[in-house]
């Protein structure tokens, strides 16, 4: 029954994705640009290995509002969350092309745990009567949204979890990834320890290698010290060192040399930590880590379009109703959000917000239990 249901999905599904407007291919992968029914765009990458294994990197948001300094997607700002259909339709598209689906990673555009629809998508992707994927064939990569990690542990404990680490100290990571002010390294790693304890599953740590930023011997020693604070669960942590993929909108960031990456890796390995240097695919078509930016024009016009997108952004302030502190949000003028979860960086209170035309309003204030925390 399940194969028949999946065949019906493949043949008869009315995709929420309005159109495939661009496809680029290299030796081992395809990058597809989709335009949604409202004109927003997302990118999806399919990796096709010689052994016959097909893996797909899908997006959970159009754009991203977290502003990581090395990421092309972050320069666009958050446009909106994808619906559950828009998430799963990225997979249906490849199914309609006759591709088998062996594994899926939420490593495309956006932060998965900032979109509640991701958990609905996990339900559909793992439901036997729908896509029928094993939880272990799915990976979610996060910048460290603690409530999302905790929910994944409870509801989908066998889904693979990857944490975008990228720096050995809070001070450095805050300059690269502002989310660190809300969820510092110690809090996230404590939460990952709990995940390992409850699931007995390996956690992957991603570390992008940036020349003269986070790649020195001292940084490697700091990283070793950080991870040994979690020595009890260290055997189930695995560190991936990722050669940085430079883009036209992140030109201030430069990749570390291969020699430097190998030296960094040697220090980590000699400390007894599981580590490897990740092989990268797709940098020639801007489909590798950190390169997805929803571009759709010729390469000559890509920089012009990205600058236009940046000019359509605004930084707006949200006042926490509990502690009265202000949080700065980067949004686009066409951003529309309903019931978007947000945590106050200072008091950790959770609220739901609505965003429309640069106007932010709180539609659900923290309850008494949340405030007491």
Please report, for each region that a protein language model flagged, where it lies by residue.
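Short, intrinsically disordered terminal segments enriched in charged and Pro/Gly residues
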Residues: 307-317, 331-335, 354-373
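Short cysteine-rich clusters marking metal-coordination/redox-active sites
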Residues: 68, 320-323, 344-347
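Flexible, acidic/Gly-rich N-terminal and inter-domain linker regions that tether
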Residues: 1-54, 306
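Canonical Radical SAM [4Fe-4S] cluster-binding loop centered on the CxxxCxxC motif
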Residues: 48-86
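Conserved AdoMet/S-adenosylmethionine-binding subsite of the radical SAM
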Residues: 94-103, 108-271
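Residues immediately within or flanking Cys/His clusters that coordinate Zn2+
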Residues: 61, 65, 286, 315-317, ...
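Radical SAM enzyme core and accessory elements
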Residues: 1-13, 270, 280-307
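Cys/His-rich microdomains that often coordinate metals
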Residues: 68, 75, 327-329, 351-353
């Amino acid at each position: 029954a399940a194969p028949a249901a999946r065949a019906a999905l493949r043949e008869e599904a009315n995709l929420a994705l309005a159109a495939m407007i661009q496809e680029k291919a290299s030796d081992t992968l395809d990058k597809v640009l989709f335009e949604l029914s409202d004109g927003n765009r997302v990118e999806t990458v399919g990796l096709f290995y010689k052994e016959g294994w097909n893996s797909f990197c899908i997006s959970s948001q159009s754009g991203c509002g977290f502003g990581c300094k090395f990421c092309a997607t972050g320069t666009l700002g958050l446009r909106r969350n994808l619906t559950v259909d828009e998430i799963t339709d990225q997979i249906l598209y490849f199914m309609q092309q006759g591709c088998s689906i062996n594994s899926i990673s939420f490593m495309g555009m956006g932060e998965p745990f900032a979109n509640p629809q991701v958990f609905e998508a996990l339900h559909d992707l793992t439901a036997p009567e729908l896509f029928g994927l094993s939880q272990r064939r799915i990976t979610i990569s996060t910048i460290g949204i603690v409530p999302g990690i905790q929910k994944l542990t409870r509801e989908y404990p066998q889904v693979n979890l990857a944490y975008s680490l990228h720096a050995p100290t809070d001070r450095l990571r805050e300059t690269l990834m502002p989310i660190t002010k809300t969820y510092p390294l110690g809090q996230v790693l404590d939460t990952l320890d709990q995940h390992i304890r409850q699931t007995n599953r390996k956690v992957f740590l991603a570390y992008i290698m940036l020349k003269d930023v986070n790649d020195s011997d001292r940084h490697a020693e700091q990283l070793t010290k950080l991870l040994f604070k979690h020595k009890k669960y260290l055997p189930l942590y695995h560190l991936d060192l990722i050669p940085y993929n430079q883009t036209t909108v992140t030109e201030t960031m430069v990749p570390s040399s291969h020699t430097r990456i190998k030296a960094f890796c040697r220090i980590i390995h000699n400390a007894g930590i599981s580590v490897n240097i990740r092989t990268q695919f797709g940098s020639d078509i801007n489909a590798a880590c950190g390169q997805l930016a929803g571009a759709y024009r010729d390469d000559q016009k890509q920089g012009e379009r990205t600058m236009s997108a940046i000019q359509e952004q605004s930084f707006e302030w949200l006042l926490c109703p509990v502690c009265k502190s202000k949080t700065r949000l980067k949004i686009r003028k066409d951003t529309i959000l309903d019931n978007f979860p947000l945590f106050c960086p200072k008091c950790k209170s959770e609220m739901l917000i609505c965003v429309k035309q640069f106007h932010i309003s709180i539609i659900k204030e923290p309850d008494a239990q949340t405030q007491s925390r």
